[in-house]
Amino acid sequence: MTLTDLPASLSSCRRCADAGYFIGSTPISTLNAGAVFMTVGQAPGRHEAEVTHLPFSGPAGRRLFRWLAQAGFDEATFRATQAMVAITRCYPGPHPAGRGDRVPSRAEQALCAPWLAAELTLIRPRVLIPIGGLAIGKFLGNDTTMTDLIGERFERDGHLIVPLPHPSGASQWFNVPENKVRLGRALEILAELQRLIGPRDAQS
C-alpha cells in the first residue's frame, strides 16, 4: 500500500462495524507525505464527527493549537503540512456515564492498529506527539504516569516522542500547578525541535 492509496482504503474500512462495534463517523485523519511531526490522539470527538471531519477541531483542538502556537506552530500550516492521526479513527460515541467520549476498547484499538502502523511506515515522521493517556501508553507503555512523562523527550524506533496531556476541558490533570510547568517544558521541547529539525528536506 502507498500513501496515495491509504486514505481511500481507510475510508472504506469496516473492521469495527463488522465486529459489532458502534461507529459514529467515517474515519478521520490528516496525512501529508512530507510530515515531520505527527500528532496521535485517542479518537475523533463528536464535533469532529458531526461538523468538521478534521482531527482536533473542536474545543479540545482549539486548546491544543493554542499550546502548539506557544511552540511556534501555525494551525493552518500545521494542518497543511504535518500529520494528525489517532489510535482509533472513528467517533466511538458518548461515554456511558454521560461526560465526554467513550474510550475505545482494546479490541477496537487492535482492529485500528494496522492503519497507524502503515502511516508510521509510509510517512516516517521524525517527531511523534502522543496526546492523552491512551496514545502515550501506545508509544511509551503504561508503567509510568503522565506526571513523569510530560515535559520529557524520548526516542523509540527512530522517532523522537514528546507526549502532551489531553487538552480536554474535563481533564483534572491541570488542577495541579506543577503539571502546568510540565506542559510548558513539553512545549519548549517542541519549539526547539521545530527550530533544529525544520522541514523534511533538512533531515539527514
List where the protein language model places each region.
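Intrinsically disordered, low-complexity and often Lys/Arg-enriched segments
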Residues: P199-S204
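A polyanion-binding, active-site-adjacent surface
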Residues: M1-G198
